[in-house]
From Swiss-Prot:
Residues 21-428 are virion surface. It comes from Suid herpesvirus 1 (strain Rice) (SuHV-1). Disulfide bonds join C274-C300, C283-C292, C319-C331. Phosphorylated within the acidic cluster. Phosphorylation determines whether endocytosed viral gE traffics to the trans-Golgi network or recycles to the cell membrane. This is Envelope glycoprotein E. Residues 450-577 are intravirion. The chain crosses the membrane at residues 429-449.
Length: 577
């Protein structure tokens, strides 16, 4: 009975204190960072408020008591618990403080671990006509374990629970919950319950450890830089005063060495007849270029300072970069000319160009047109080089009479004709010669192959003669045949011997047939020594009277005929006519 009475006394004390105490305004604080409340887009609403029962004080809360949206319904019957969003870096300490205007006399802290909660925000949630701020979690946010008790807060006169919770606030008699060296496993919902229900809800998100601070990186080392800021046009009337000194902005960078500087003002007349007056910036940095010394329209353009008049100068011999922008007035300098023109006349109207040098190099420049209303022209700043005047040679200096080098007039080198293909070098000559030789070899080889192929084709092609049918046929090979030596009149090689050859009479009478010529060669002798008689051609049938010679049909073999060996060898070695 004693434990039961003790528990009953605890519950009665909690209920009495809760009814007599107003709901406090809750806050959350983290160490080292403050509480962050971030609005979120629409997401699924989970109100994780629960009602604490008798069994909740004995140990872990039942996870089934968490009902989505049920806490909002309870919020319409009583004051909703404040909701807080706390972001903590990994490894940091944080403290959840539930104190407000009214102290919480007794309560218990619970923890619900969740994962995947990327979109979390504190948003106004309305149920019917009642609205209250509540935590809004994304759909990907899911609990990993049931909600469990992690600490309690009771007055000193109330006996404590026998079981020590896993995490106990060091301030046992105040509604604080402190977590040391937070890890990602500490991400979740922390709720403070009292006898009437949830009193405060905290969502703690433990993120990655912030990167260690890096050593500050200074600007890259650079040389001094200057920039002139002035008016590009000034209108005046005769008798007025105008100042040519612009504002010079200086950035000395990391330089610690003294430097020299000059400020030069150049004057050029700007005729009113020029609709546009051009100032070419490349010529400020390269005043000796041929294009700058001999521009196309020198009267309406400012190109090289060598073509203008130097009207004023400031020369600084040694100046410290530690002075910053004050070096123009703090450093000693030598000057001549007038920077401020008082009681100006109309003759002083024109273009004034300021060129500033730093250690002998052009650092910045600026221009201003000082003119009356009648002589005002439009000035245009060009970023390209001007066009070269016709007849200007392409050699150094750009002039055919004299050039300027560091203020000294020297004769110009002789002009050379312009070669659009560049200067001829031995390498180019070698390439041209090699190309010509290769082309000659290719053409000669092609011609030789054509001649060779044509000769081979002519040698292998048989000779054909046309016929009356319009076709072509192989031409017969005619040669003399051996006959009786009585018909021999001379050598075959003698052209006149052909006329003396005898022809046998036609067996057909006047049929027009003319037999073949008989051979009169001495070599055509009868091969047989037994028969010394004359060879008589056998009678043949009459033939046509055409003048075209046809190849005779094969003769029957004659036993004692002439020797055709010489004739056969001649036919085999004969070439087509």
């Amino acid at each position: 009975m004693r434990p039961f009475l003790l528990r009953a006394a605890q519950l009665l004390a909690l209920l009495a204190l809760a009814l007599s105490t107003e709901a406090p305004s809750l806050s959350a604080e983290t160490t080292p960072g403050p509480v962050t409340e971030v609005p979120s887009p629409s997401a699924e609403v989970w109100d994780l408020s629960t009602e604490a029962g008798d069994d909740d004080l004995d140990g872990d809360l039942n996870g089934d008591d968490r009902r989505a949206g049920f806490g909002s319904a309870l919020a319409s019957l009583r004051e909703a618990p404040p909701a807080h969003l706390v972001n903590v870096s990994e490894g940091a300490n944080f403290t959840l403080d539930a104190r407000g205007d009214g102290a919480v006399v007794a309560g218990i802290w619970t923890f619900l671990p969740v994962r995947g909660c990327d979109a979390v925000a504190v948003t106004m949630v309305c149920f019917e006509t009642a609205c209250h701020p509540d935590l809004v979690l994304g759909r990907a946010c899911v609990p990993e374990a049931p909600e469990r008790g992690i600490g309690d807060y009771l007055p000193p006169e109330v006996p404590r629970l026998q079981r020590e919770p896993p995490i106990v606030t060091p301030e046992r008699w105040s509604p604080h919950l402190t977590v040391r060296r937070a890890t990602p496993n500490d991400t979740g919902l922390y709720t403070l319950h009292d006898a009437s229900g949830p009193r405060a809800v905290f969502f703690v998100a433990v993120g990655d450890r912030p990167p260690a601070p890096l050593a500050p990186v200074g600007p890259a080392r650079h040389e001094p830089r200057f920039h002139a800021l002035g008016f590009h046009s000034q209108l005046f009337s005769p008798g007025d005063t105008f100042d040519l000194m612009p504002r010079v902005v200086s950035d000395m960078g990391d330089s610690r060495e003294n430097f020299t500087a000059t400020l030069d003002w150049y004057y050029a007349r700007a005729p009113p007849r020029c609709l546009l007056y051009y100032v070419y910036e490349p010529c400020i940095y390269h005043p000796r270029a041929p294009e700058c010394l001999r521009p196309v329209d020198p009267a309406c353009s400012f190109t090289s300072p060598a073509r203008a008049a130097l009207v004023a100068r400031r020369a600084y011999a040694s100046c410290s970069p530690l002075l910053g922008d004050r070096w123009l007035t703090a450093c000693p300098f030598d000057a001549f000319g007038e920077e401020v023109h008082t009681n100006a006349t109309a003759d002083e109207s024109g273009l004034y160009v300021l060129v500033m040098t730093h250690n002998g190099h052009v650092a910045t420049w600026d221009y201003t047109l000082v003119a009356t209303a009648a002589e005002y022209v439009t000035v245009i700043k060009e970023l390209t080089a001007p066009a070269r005047a016709p007849g200007t040679p392409w050699g150094p200096g750009g002039g055919d009479d004299a050039i300027y080098v560091d203020g000294v007039t020297t004769p110009a080198p002789p002009a050379r004709p312009w070669n659009p293909y560049g200067r001829t070098t031995p390498g180019r000559l070698f390439v041209l010669a090699l190309g010509s030789f290769v082309m000659t070899c290719v053409v000669g080889g092609a011609v030789w192959l054509c001649v060779l192929c044509s000769r081979r084709r002519a040698a292998s092609r048989p000779f054909r003669v046309p016929t009356r049918a319009g076709t072509r046929m192989l031409s017969p090979v005619y040669t003399s045949l051996p006959t009786h030596e009585d018909y021999y009149d001379g050598d075959d090689d003698d052209e006149e011997a052909g006329d003396a050859r005898r022809r046998p009479s036609s067996p057909g009478g006047d049929s027009g047939y003319e037999g073949p010529y008989v051979s009169l060669d001495a070599e055509d002798e009868f091969s047989s020594d037994e028969d010394d008689g004359l060879y008589v051609r056998p009678e043949e049938a009459p033939r046509s009277g055409f003048d075209v010679w046809f190849r005779d049909p094969e003769k029957p073999e004659v036993t004692n005929g002439p020797n055709y060996g010489v004739t056969a060898s001649r036919l085999l070695n004969a070439r087509p006519a």
